[in-house]
């Protein structure tokens, strides 16, 4: 993960409770979150269910701009976005961008991105290569980029 954004004064534990409903961190999550908030590059290896996603989701909610999350599976993207929207109760905070979107859904993603409301954007690797995606991302402030699955890297 790489960061170039400024961090507001919010306390990570308060945001953890507000957006995700958790009272505390698991394992090394807090150290990773603090590193991301400090603008440090991070490489995180955790087993399934250990809370890797929180390591980028929480900083994204706290930082200025939109975090780009590269994720290979449409179902995983949808699940992550649905979970965030469920706690935050604001659909514009998280979106995914992939081939499953209708034209109306795509237009809503673009509108929310350009308005600065979107904090997390999940993107499939093949979508990230498209010229229209690149053009959209050039118009928004990107807080950092996270690669959610190692097999997205080659």
Please name every model-derived segment.
Residues 118-119, 127-129, 133-154:
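SF2 helicase catalytic motif II
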Residues 67-68, 74-130:
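Conserved nucleic-acid-binding Ia/Ib motif block in the N-terminal RecA-like helicase ATPase lobe
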Residues 41-42, 65-68, 117-121, 141-144:
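Loop/turn-to-beta-strand initiation segments
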Residues 2-47:
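Conserved pre-motif I regulatory segment
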Residues 39-58, 68-73:
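Walker A/P-loop
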Residues 33, 57, 107-110, 134:
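Short hydrophobic/charged patches on amphipathic alpha-helices used for structural packing
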């Amino acid at each position: 993960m790489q960061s170039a954004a400024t961090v507001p004064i919010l306390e990570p534990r308060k945001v953890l409770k507000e957006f995700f409903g958790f009272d505390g961190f698991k394992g090394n999550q807090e150290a990773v979150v603090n590193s991301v908030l400090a603008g440090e590059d991070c490489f995180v290896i955790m087993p399934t269910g250990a809370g890797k996603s929180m390591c980028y989701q929480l900083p994204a909610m706290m930082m200025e701009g939109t975090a780009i999350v590269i994720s290979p599976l449409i179902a995983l993207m949808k699940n992550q976005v649905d979970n965030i929207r469920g706690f935050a109760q604001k659909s514009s905070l998280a979106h995914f961008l992939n081939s499953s979107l209708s034209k109306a859904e795509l237009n809503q993603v673009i509108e929310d991105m350009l308005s600065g409301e979107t904090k997390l954007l999940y993107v499939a690797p093949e979508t990230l290569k498209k010229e229209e995606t690149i053009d959209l991302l050039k118009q928004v402030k990107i807080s950092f980029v996270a690669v959610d699955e190692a097999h997205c890297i080659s």
